[in-house]
A protein has these predicted regions:
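Domain-level signature for soluble enzymes in the chorismate/prephenate branch of the shikimate pathway
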Residues: 1-115
């Protein structure tokens, strides 16, 4: 990977919020959730960009759906989730849905590029 290309990405920032353990009001809870949602949207948009790059790079349409890679991603996510204290009951279905939607997006991008 080109180090200079990697440094061109702006650092992800999350708006100021109260730590969940310190929240005393529902307004504080909602502000925290909203701040995290805005950050997640930015991350998901960037992830989508990588799916578009994959569609451009992959040599054939069959390469878009890679069952082995899906299971590798889920395993890595679950390991990271456990370290972060995120429940498997949230992490696994969220990522499986995310992967499914990203693959659908990648197929559409692949077809559009080769139209």
């Amino acid at each position: 990977a080109n180090a200079s290309a990697m440094s061109n990405r702006p650092a992800l920032t999350v708006d100021a919020r109260t730590d969940p353990a310190e929240c005393q009001t529902m307004d504080q809870v909602r502000q925290g959730v909203d701040a995290l949602d805005r950050a997640l949207v930015r991350l998901l948009a960037e992830r989508q960009g990588y799916m578009e790059a994959a569609a451009r790079i992959k040599p054939d349409r069959q390469a878009v759906h890679d069952a082995e890679r899906i299971e590798d991603v889920v395993a890595k996510v679950l390991a990271a989730a456990r370290k972060a204290g995120l429940s498997d009951d949230i992490a696994e279905p969220v990522w499986r849905t995310l992967i499914d939607r990203c693959i659908a997006h990648e197929f559409a991008a692949y077809d559009r590029l080769r139209g």
